[in-house]
A protein has these predicted regions:
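Extracytoplasmic low-complexity, Pro/Thr/Ser/Ala/Gly-rich segments
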Residues: 8-55
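Secretory targeting and sorting signals
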Residues: 1-8
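Extracytosolic low-complexity repeat regions of secreted or lipid-anchored proteins
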Residues: 38, 46-110
Length: 110
């Protein structure tokens, strides 16, 4: 019996520059549609924004908190409190404390 080779792990991504699906040329305050997946964009001057719906009003683009790149849902986010991220499948994540432990949770439920 021979050993099965281990699958290669993706390279770490700890900032917006390596995050897939960030939409260019977004207008701050403009309407947007999806507040759950691939929510990030950049303005013409390079500011990172995200599509959000405060208090369930119509979604629009807001200035983004600091972004930690691509992270796994429900993984520890110690050191990234109040930051946002994106899961490998595009889910919007935010670092939330749950029972005293910081974890990456859904950003559209924060």
């Amino acid at each position: 019996m021979s050993a099965v080779p281990a699958a290669a792990q993706p390279a770490p991504c700890d900032d917006p520059s390596c995050t897939p699906g960030i939409r260019p040329a977004v207008v701050l305050g403009a309407p947007c549609t999806d507040t759950a997946h691939f929510v990030f964009g950049t303005t013409s001057w390079g500011r990172l924004v995200f599509c959000g719906s405060p208090r369930r009003y119509e979604p629009r683009y807001f200035r983004s908190p600091s972004m930690a790149g691509v992270k796994e849902f429900d993984a520890s986010c110690a050191g990234y409190e109040n930051w946002v991220a994106q899961s490998p499948d595009g889910l919007f994540l935010s670092c939330q404390s749950n029972n005293g432990a910081p974890r990456w949770g859904r950003g559209d439920d924060a």
